[in-house]
């Protein structure tokens, strides 16, 4: 009879916490296994199967390996691990001849790592965050405390923006990751936030490749969009109907318009630069204009729910990557708004981990 872990009851609290502590070092393996699975197209291979239930050998026969038989034995262990982490389901059946057949299929969790009907997934975002350039910075996290240094800057002698400008491969990884995750986020945002209704012109400051504006204009085609970002960023931006790509520096000035978007911009900067950016936005707005800030709002107290865990984890990411970068509380956003001249802010909607906050000029 097979041994099932589901039948084991652990009621001793001390044992539970000790076992959780013992498991902590294994957290690294999940990211690395997922990275390998994405690079090998494992999830996509299963998704494209007519049965969507494949054995390790059936999967191995579709990847560029010299020996599918040998590779399937290693792959089986990878697949079992992913099943234990809820990224796959494992199906074990016994044939009439007594042979055991094991197959795997996708779960809602792994569905997020395969391309949706728009070609977007979270896979490029996971690859970016497990890239050696990013991971190596984490080894210097203690220096943020001991020496007050930004780990990424210490590792590479420049900030993350300068690095992506210099390294075309990393710039491509970053753009692809942001393109995919932005597409997913913005589909949700335009569903739950109606603040773009009746708007004639929208400026997306730091808009990258223009994905956010494209999502907005697909629902509100009468909007004229200006996608504003650094010249080396917009040079790779695709052409969209109704969108003009404009190069510039948000720390100096931004184009004028009735509504300005700042999506995941402020968390990259310290308070002083945030106020500069917001003041430039304030000057570019008409009296009845507003800035739509799309950011994560950090809770005042470190709770242990899914939202809180993610928000505090992203705050660590900002600390590693950017000088003064951080996730902010609602009060901290209010303080920035007042310093920049805005009269008030209002939290309008939430999409996944992101909140839509309106900053009013008057």
UniProtKB/Swiss-Prot annotation:
Disruption phenotype: Accumulation of 3-monomethyl myricetin but reduced levels of dimethylated and trimethylated myricetin. It holds the Pfam family Dimerisation. It catalyses: myricetin + S-adenosyl-L-methionine = laricitrin + S-adenosyl-L-homocysteine + H(+). Pathway: Flavonoid metabolism. It is an enzyme of class 2 (transferase). The active site is at 267 (proton acceptor). One of its GO terms (biological process) is methylation. GO terms for molecular function: myricetin 3'-O-methyltransferase activity; O-methyltransferase activity; protein dimerization activity; S-adenosylmethionine-dependent methyltransferase activity. Keywords: Methyltransferase, S-adenosyl-L-methionine, Transferase. Mainly expressed in stem and petiole trichomes. Gene3D superfamilies: Vaccinia Virus protein VP39, Winged helix-like DNA-binding domain superfamily/Winged helix DNA-binding domain. Its EC number is 2.1.1.267. S-adenosyl-L-methionine binds at residue 229. Homodimer. Flavonoid 3'-O-methyltransferase involved in the biosynthesis of polymethoxylated flavonoids natural products such as myricetin derivatives, aroma compounds possessing antioxidant properties and exhibiting pharmacological activities such as anti-carcinogen, anti-viral, anti-thrombotic, anti-diabetic, anti-atherosclerotic, and anti-inflammatory effects. Catalyzes S-adenosylmethionine-dependent regioselective 3'-O-methylation of flavonoids; active on various hydroxylated flavonoid substrates, including myricetin, thus producing 3'-methyl myricetin (laricitrin). Belongs to the class I-like SAM-binding methyltransferase superfamily. Cation-independent O-methyltransferase family. This is Myricetin 3'-O-methyltransferase 4.
């Amino acid at each position: 009879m097979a041994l099932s872990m589901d039948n084991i009851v652990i009621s001793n609290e001390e044992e539970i916490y000790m076992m959780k502590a013992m498991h902590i070092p294994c957290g690294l393996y999940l990211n690395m296994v997922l990275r390998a699975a994405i690079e090998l197209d494992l999830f996509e291979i299963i998704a494209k199967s007519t049965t969507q239930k494949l054995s390790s050998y059936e999967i191995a026969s579709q990847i560029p390996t010299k020996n599918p038989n040998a590779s399937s034995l290693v792959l089986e262990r990878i697949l079992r691990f992913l099943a234990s982490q809820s990224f796959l389901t494992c199906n074990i059946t016994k044939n009439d001849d007594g042979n055991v057949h094991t197959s795997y299929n996708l779960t809602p969790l792994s569905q997020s790592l395969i391309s949706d009907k728009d070609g977007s997934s979270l896979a490029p975002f996971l690859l970016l965050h497990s890239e050696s350039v990013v991971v190596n910075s984490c080894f210097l996290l203690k220096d943020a405390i001991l020496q007050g240094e930004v780990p990424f800057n210490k590792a590479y002698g420049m900030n993350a923006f300068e690095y992506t400008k210099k390294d075309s491969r990393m710039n491509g990884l970053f753009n692809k990751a942001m393109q995919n995750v932005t597409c997913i986020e913005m589909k949700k945002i335009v569903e739950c936030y109606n603040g773009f209704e009746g708007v004639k012109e929208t400026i997306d400051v730091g808009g990258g490749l223009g994905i956010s504006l494209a999502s907005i204009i697909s629902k509100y085609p009468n909007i004229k969009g200006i996608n504003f970002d650094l010249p080396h960023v917009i040079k790779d931006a695709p052409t969209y109907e109704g969108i003009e790509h404009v190069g510039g520096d948000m720390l100096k000035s931004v184009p004028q318009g009735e509504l300005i978007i700042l999506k995941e911009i402020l968390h990259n900067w310290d308070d002083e630069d945030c106020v500069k950016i917001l003041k430039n936005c304030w000057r570019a707005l008409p009296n009845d204009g507003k800035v739509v800030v799309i950011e994560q709002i950090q809770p005042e107290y470190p709770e242990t729910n899914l939202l809180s865990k993610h928000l505090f984890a992203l705050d660590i990411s900002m600390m590693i990557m950017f000088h003064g970068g951080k996730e902010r509380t609602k009060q901290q956003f209010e303080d920035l708004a007042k310093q920049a001249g805005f009269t008030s802010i209002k939290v309008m909607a939430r999409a996944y981990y992101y909140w839509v906050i309106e900053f009013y000029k008057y």
